[in-house]
Amino acid sequence: MTAPSQVLKIRRPDDWHLHLRDGDMLKTVVPYTSEIYGRAIVMPNLAPPVTTVEAAVAYRQRILDAVPAGHNFTPLMTCYLTDSLDPNELERGFNEGVFTAAKLYPANATTNSSHGVTSIDAIMPVLERMEKIGMPLLVHGEVTHADIDIFDREARFIESVMEPLRQRLTALKVVFEHITTKDAADYVRDGNERLAATITPQHLMFNRNHMLVGGVRPHLYCLPILKRNIHQQALRELVASGFNRVFLGTDSAPHARHRKESSCGCAGCFNAPTALGSYATVFEEMNALQHFEAFCSVNGPQFYGLPVNDTFIELVREEQQVAESIALTDDTLVPFLAGETVRWSVKQ
């Protein structure tokens, strides 16, 4: 006899960290987000990056054009910070409701980040303006110096960049994105109300052993890279505690299969189809389902000063198999947990 399925009804969630790419890839991946989430913070690391109001408006329209009829989805656009960015352009975009936040990529930290910031001092006028107007700063928190081990880059970023920055601009709202370490979990938990964090499903579900033991699993390779089990455990404990300044940010980052399964593969997990069920599984494993809705649907809007969504969705607890791949025009896309049986999924 099979156990009856369970249903979780939650306020419609938002994704506070998402890559949608552009062109045909954009058209393929947008529906996986727009059918589930009310809003998403869209990353600006296109080629070339989104650095002007005009570019953000055009990109937003391309996203909206890819949203299927019947989906009620609002993309929240971000500005890519560069050493040469004009603070007036940033403020104009924020005041006009085009830019929700600005994104700090240390130069060469991740995909399409070669235009990123070379030093905090180089963009201090921009950051001071953001502090003044109340615009959130979203941070990819890794140092990129060649001599620093890839597994240490987040912890080093906290001491060398994040803490000095927050000491200098004490009123600046900062989201420490896709945190992956106990160091970052402790730092955010011990911080004030102007510091928050997002966490991905892969960093809650897996550690570096899952990616490297018994063969390299390229579809678990993302940046920041998966860390040791002690770090994974710290992240799980943070979300399970009900801490209200951590929220859902999938960092869903699609790459065609041939760009992942290669001699020099790209970083990123395309988790949009399976992320919400993955988060539910983690919260269930941690006996913390009472905090699941807040993590997905309340904490983010609260930090950004936005209303929560007024519609609801349901997740059902019944085993389903994830597709092995998703068709692209001239390749395929391998989703997070491809071919695996998952416990929770969004009720269709």
From Swiss-Prot:
One of its GO terms (cellular component) is cytosol. Pathway: Pyrimidine metabolism; UMP biosynthesis via de novo pathway; (S)-dihydroorotate from bicarbonate: step 3/3. It is an enzyme of class 3 (hydrolase). Substrate binds at H19, L20, R21, N45, H140, L223, H255, A267. Its cofactor is Zn(2+). It comes from the Bacteria. Keywords: Hydrolase, Metal-binding, Pyrimidine biosynthesis, Zinc. Gene3D superfamilies: Metal-dependent hydrolases. It catalyses: (S)-dihydroorotate + H2O = N-carbamoyl-L-aspartate + H(+). Binds 2 Zn(2+) ions per subunit. Zn(2+) 2 binds at K103, H140, H178. GO terms for molecular function: dihydroorotase activity; zinc ion binding. The modification N6-carboxylysine is found at K103. Its EC number is 3.5.2.3. Zn(2+) 1 binds at H17, H19, K103, D251. GO terms for biological process: 'de novo' pyrimidine nucleobase biosynthetic process; 'de novo' UMP biosynthetic process. InterPro entries: Amidohydro-rel, DHOdimr, Dihydroorotase_CS, Metal_Hydrolase. Catalyzes the reversible cyclization of carbamoyl aspartate to dihydroorotate. Homodimer. This is Dihydroorotase. The lineage of its organism: Bacteria, Pseudomonadati, Pseudomonadota, Gammaproteobacteria, Enterobacterales.
